[in-house]
Amino acid sequence: MIAFTLLLSFLVALVAAKPTTCTKGAHVIVARGSLEPQGPGAMGELAEKVLKLVPGSDIESLVYPALYNEYLESQPVGVRTLTSVIQAYVKNCPKTQLVLMGYSQGAHVIMDTICGASSTGFPATLPQPSFVTDKISSVILLGDPSLTEGQTFHVGTSVGSGMFPRNLPAGCDSIAKKTVSVCDKGDPFCEAGGKDLSVHLGYIPVWGDYVVKESVRLAKAFIKKAKAC
């Protein structure tokens, strides 16, 4: 616990020290999966493709522990950090769109931040206000443990819910039309009872082109709408 507290203090200092630079394209925030080193992780490959296809964009890697054994402590830290990051960015850069991309625990962090945390075992939080969600052009998720059966933005072959389904899935309604949450059958995290870890680790080559295309489509639609206003 002492080591975790020291790590948390270090991460908070890193976040606080980072200046804000507004972009004309999209500000892409990437939340890595469990046990990946600090940075964008596997999702970074897809984020870089979005940057190339949406001119004037930049990328930010969410600074949070991404621990596995301490998941119940690590994930809420990510939620608190991402909440601070996106609210500060929207206030400082109100004309810039946000693209959120998360893998595994990172996907869970993003959805709890935006939808409000309502899964059993995690501290409850409220959904983000409209001044934040209105600036989000797309949310791209791979292997989200909080995926809940019936959510319209699910794509893939999985059945049922993830390990940590939402008790209040309606909190995601504000971003449902701009979210893509990929989960395939056998993934032990986004499909509770799944037993094939290779499915969870294999989304980039299978779904990468699709989610990049969707993110870019939504980003360009956001820019077009902003210019029309």
How should each PLM-predicted stretch be described?
Residues 27, 137-140, 178-180:
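Structural motif
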Residues 20-97, 182-212, 219:
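Active-site catalytic motif of lipid deacylating hydrolases and related acyltransferases
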Residues 151-229:
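C-terminal catalytic-base region of ester-bond hydrolases, centering on the histidine
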Residues 6, 71, 128:
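Generic anion/oxyanion-binding catalytic loop in active/binding sites
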Residues 1-20, 228-229:
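Fungal secretory targeting signals
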Residues 12, 23, 54, 95, ...:
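Short, well-ordered coil/turn elements that cap or connect secondary structure elements
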Residues 82-173:
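Serine-dependent carboxylesterase/thioesterase catalytic core
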